[in-house]
């Protein structure tokens, strides 16, 4: 599904959230059933951004991210940082979409799993090389525990030559699972904001998904049984 931009560059808030939820389901990115997560924990739903595999899907995905970033952070940023590996196509697709929708050129950057020690683009980063004065938005698919930011944050700050030289404007993810992070009573995104001091936002929350597919839906995707599991 391709977005139909308004004069301001995107859809109204509720419309784009509803369409994004349908887009995730149609793309087989968001699934409901009985899943075992990497942590070993059971979950009634599973999200895999690696299922976005076609050009049209990535083109559309970039537009949803671009609007969410614009709505949450405005134009107060220069760089999209997508942690390797899944964050790389997210950063690329969104930088393209942001230029198209809002007329602002945004650079993309990612980290390398292994630092390159030769060539003109050697170093720990892929794409644009972040430096002092840059304003960065971190872009990821989803965060369950907030552990990924523990790796990403120091990699970005390591590029500074003066303390505070690089500003992290915020983080954006596809879905806020709204689950407690570890032993905390807060969600992973709330924990990130509290610990690092920048806002962590999502295109949609799990509550948005439930409202669209269960409360307002026909319960064919989120059944009564799955809803009960989500509520546990």
Give the positions of each predicted feature.
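A contiguous pocket-lining binding segment that forms or flanks enzyme active sites
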Residues: 125-170, 176
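Solvent-exposed alpha-helices and their adjacent loops that cap or buttress functional pockets
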Residues: 38, 127-131, 193-194
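PRPP-dependent phosphoribosyltransferase catalytic core
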Residues: 14-22, 158-232
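Phosphate/pyrophosphate-binding loops at sites that engage ATP/ADP/AMP, CoA/4′-phosphopantetheine
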Residues: 66-77, 157-163
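Short, glycine/charge-rich flexible loops or terminal/linker lids adjacent to PRPP-binding catalytic cores
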Residues: 90-136, 147-151
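Short, Lys/Arg-enriched N-terminal segments with co-localized hydrophobic residues
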Residues: 1-12
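Active-site-facing substrate-recognition patch
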Residues: 12-73
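Short glycine-rich phosphate-binding loop at a beta-alpha junction
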Residues: 75-86
């Amino acid at each position: 599904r391709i977005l139909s931009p308004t004069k301001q560059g995107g859809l109204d808030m509720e419309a784009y959230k509803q369409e994004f939820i349908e887009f995730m389901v149609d793309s087989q990115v968001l699934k409901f059933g009985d899943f075992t997560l990497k942590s070993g924990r059971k979950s009634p739903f599973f999200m895999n951004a690696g299922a976005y595999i076609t050009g049209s899907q990535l083109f559309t995905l970039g537009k949803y991210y671009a609007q969410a970033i614009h709505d949450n952070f405005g134009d107060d940023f220069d760089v999209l940082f997508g942690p390797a590996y899944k964050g790389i196509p997210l950063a690329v697709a969104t930088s393209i979409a942001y230029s198209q929708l809002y007329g602002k050129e945004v650079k993309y950057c990612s980290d390398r799993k292994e630092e390159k020690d030769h060539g003109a683009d050697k170093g720990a980063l892929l794409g644009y090389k972040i430096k002092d004065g840059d304003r960065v938005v971190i872009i990821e698919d989803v965060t369950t525990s907030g552990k990924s930011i523990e790796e990403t944050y120091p990699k970005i700050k390591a590029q500074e030559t003066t303390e505070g030289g690089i500003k992290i404007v915020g983080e954006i993810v596809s879905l806020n699972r709204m689950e407690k992070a570890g032993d905390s009573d807060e969600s992973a995104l709330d924990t990130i904001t509290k610990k690092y001091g920048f806002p962590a936002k999502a295109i949609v929350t799990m509550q948005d998904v439930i409202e669209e597919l269960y409360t307002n839906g026909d319960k064919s995707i989120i059944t009564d049984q799955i809803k009960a599991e989500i509520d546990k």
